[in-house]
Amino acid sequence: MLKAVHFGAGNIGRGFIGYLLYKSGYEITFVDISKELVESINNYKRYNVIILKDNVEKEEVKNIKAIHIEDEENLSKAIVDADIVTTSVGANNLKSIGEKLINYLKIRKANIDKPLNIMACENALFATNILKNSILEKGDRDFIEYVNQKIGFPNTAVDRIVPNVDIKKELPIDVAVEDFYEWDIEKKAIIGDLNIRGAELVDDLEPYIERKLFLLNGAHATTAYLGYLKGYKYIHEAIEDDFIRNIVSRMQEEASLALSRKHNIKKDDLERYASKVIKRFKNPYLKDEVVRVGREPTRKLSVNDRLMMPAKLCYEIGITPEFILYGIAAGFLFDYKEDPQACKIQDDIKNFGLEKTISKVTGLEENSDLLQEIVKKYKELKETFRKR
């Protein structure tokens, strides 16, 4: 049986990546920092993926085990034996994962000659490159030559909504997911064979990454931040609000126009994709909380992420990103008390002022047109919804 090692045994790891790897015939070893989660996986040796739709389905994933990330002996054996290594740990953790992999790959080099593909499955642009660079930058010439010859680092675009929904479970590690998924993999970077059921191998990954980042992730964040302002608990409630749905649809139109010009994608294809995204948001079975989708606003409002990137692209090609900027402005009003990044943004606004805070988070110059438009929309939204 093929063997996979997956870093990150959370909901995405189990409900999306692990699920597809299992359906593709892999025996999966999850690696995680949570001792409790590792113990649960090793205790049950299986879990169920609950697919949320009109007729709820349940699919079992088995042939699994787990290793704690500090268990170097067993993790080393797993990496040596692996046919594929994947991650869903958050882009901020990829560098440290890459540094951990160096020693394990050196042991693999000394023991086995078969190729290996390593893929970061994260909501970030070309995330696998982060892993690859962190591995190569500390290697000697011989190790670098081995990595370049024997290890593939395909970038990926991944998409599946995995909410923290309260649903009856057989096992505590069961996970609920939406029916839709998409996993696009950079074909030219694969070494050897790579067969994952349901994944699509593509020649040019950038259009797929940006389409998903702008039209799904950007629209999701906009729905969450506006939904939070209007007092909605769930995404499916927020997207049914005419005011919110109009802004989200219009920001998708702006981003689609920019994508069409940059990548020569047919506008009809982008319209169909955007429409499908809105339909997914309306799924009432997901019960996806706006505070989950809006969490970590410092990251989501940063220069190369889901809102600022399409806004800047629009501006550079002469499109006014009016509705994308509403989403960004709403993000600076996201003051959820249990989110450390949201609290830090609000503290910075109080201590240093709105313009300096927006500049710090987004990377925009304080006197730039885009920043000043964000300020205007921030004040407009605050006046409309916060009356304080």
UniProtKB/Swiss-Prot annotation:
The gene is mtlD. InterPro entries: 6-PGluconate_DH-like_C_sf, 6PGD_dom2, Mannitol_1_phos_5_DH, Mannitol_DH, Mannitol_DH_C, Mannitol_DH_CS, Mannitol_DH_N, NAD(P)-bd_dom_sf. Belongs to the mannitol dehydrogenase family. Its EC number is 1.1.1.17. GO terms for biological process: mannitol catabolic process. NAD(+) binds at residues 4-15. This is Mannitol-1-phosphate 5-dehydrogenase. Keywords: NAD, Oxidoreductase. PROSITE patterns: MANNITOL_DHGENASE. The lineage of its organism: Bacteria, Bacillati, Bacillota, Clostridia, Thermoanaerobacterales. GO terms for cellular component: cytosol. It catalyses: D-mannitol 1-phosphate + NAD(+) = beta-D-fructose 6-phosphate + NADH + H(+). One of its GO terms (molecular function) is mannitol-1-phosphate 5-dehydrogenase activity. PANTHER family: ALTRONATE OXIDOREDUCTASE-RELATED (PTHR30524:SF0), MANNITOL-1-PHOSPHATE 5-DEHYDROGENASE (PTHR30524). It is an enzyme of class 1 (oxidoreductase). NCBIfam families: PRK02318.2-5, PRK02318.2-6. SUPFAM superfamilies: 6-phosphogluconate dehydrogenase C-terminal domain-like, NAD(P)-binding Rossmann-fold domains.
